[in-house]
């Protein structure tokens, strides 16, 4: 996200100024909603431990043809970060559905990444039972731990999930964060220092670093609800696409292989051979091109 080379660059503070805080299920949630209401709508769901700002590199390109709605989920970005809250994927899905209802969305596309993929799986399961809010037109999943058996968590993530988690929070500084975060990017698409500083700043808004050990419980959720969430992918009546950075050590090519083994619905697949865990940040032009091709195929 180089501000010098990209005229469409949006800084985190500019991003904040373009959105607003909305009260959803009793929590103050940051929402950015741009584009004419007559355009097709995309709801964008971000990953851990970052925020809706992850979508900034492809925002301008998408906004030419779509109304875009992104939120910082509870505990992330500019949204509330309650310390004692019991965070869960189901709870985040409830907030997303509250947003869908507040915006009075009848039908829309979903574009998700990482933690957002898991939220999307729960929402997709609700769609399949007729209990979901609104009607999905499609769902596109970027790199994420769709299957707990193929999710190769970083050591830091495993420690955060342990009883040592809350103590590790206190010891994690910018240097440790930048090293771990950069490790999941592709070898030729590492984040710039400016990007790392921005991601770290967003994490620390509202003292967010200190709830990492509460947010990381989504890894347990994935195991507990595996059957429901994998079944949602297998039985989906909604077109599904996967755009995957293949060299992602957490959920790269090995995750795609498992996706195929389990015969999950797959209407479109793009494998980016030298890209890591954050395709929309590392290769925004390619992600936009593939996503638009997927949508075009639906017509």
Give the label of every model feature segment:
Residues 1-42, 63-66, 101, 105-106, ...:
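Alpha/beta-hydrolase fold catalytic core
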Residues 13, 24, 32, 70-112, ...:
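Active-site loop/oxyanion-hole signature of alpha/beta-hydrolase fold enzymes
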Residues 272-288:
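Catalytic histidine-centered segment of alpha/beta-hydrolase-like enzymes
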Residues 150, 172-234:
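Conserved alpha/beta-hydrolase catalytic His-Asp/Glu region
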Residues 33-78:
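Conserved HGGG/HGGXW glycine-rich cap/lid loop of the alpha/beta-hydrolase fold
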Residues 50-60, 78-81, 150, 224, ...:
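Short N-terminal helix/helix-N-cap motif within the alpha/beta-hydrolase-1
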Residues 235-277:
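Conserved loop-alpha-helix segment in the C-terminal half of the alpha/beta-hydrolase fold
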Residues 106-151:
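Conserved hydrolase catalytic core segment
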């Amino acid at each position: 996200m180089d501000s010098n080379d990209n005229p469409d660059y949006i800084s985190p503070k500019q991003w904040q100024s373009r959105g607003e805080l909305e009260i959803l299920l009793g929590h103050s949630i940051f929402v950015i909603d741009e584009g004419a209401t007559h355009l097709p709508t995309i709801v964008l769901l971000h990953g851990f431990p970052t925020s809706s700002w992850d979508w900034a590199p492809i925002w301008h390109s998408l906004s030419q043809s779509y109304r875009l709605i992104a939120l910082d989920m509870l505990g992330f970005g500019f949204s509330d970060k309650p310390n004692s809250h019991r965070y869960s994927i189901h709870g985040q899905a409830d907030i997303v559905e509250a947003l869908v209802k507040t915006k009075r969305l009848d039908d829309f596309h979903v574009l998700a990444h990482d933690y957002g993929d898991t939220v999307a799986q729960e929402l997709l399961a609700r769609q399949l039972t007729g209990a979901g809010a609104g009607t999905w037109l499609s769902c596109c999943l970027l790199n994420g731990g769709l299957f707990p058996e193929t999710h190769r968590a970083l050591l830091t993530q495993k420690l955060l999930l342990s009883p040592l988690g809350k103590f590790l929070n206190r010891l994690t500084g910018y240097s440790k964060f930048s090293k771990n975060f950069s490790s999941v990017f592709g070898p030729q698409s590492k984040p710039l220092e400016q990007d790392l500083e921005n991601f770290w700043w967003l994490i620390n808004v509202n003292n967010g670093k200190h709830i990492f050990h509460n947010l990381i419980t989504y890894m347990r959720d994935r195991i507990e609800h595996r059957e429901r969430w994998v079944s949602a992918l297998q039985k989906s009546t909604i077109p599904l696409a996967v755009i995957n950075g293949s060299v992602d050590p957490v959920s790269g090519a090995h995750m795609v292989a498992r996706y195929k083994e389990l015969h999950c619905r797959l209407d479109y697949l793009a494998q980016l051979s030298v890209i890591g865990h954050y395709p929309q940040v590392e290769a925004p032009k390619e992600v936009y091109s593939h996503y638009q091709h997927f949508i075009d195929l639906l017509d």
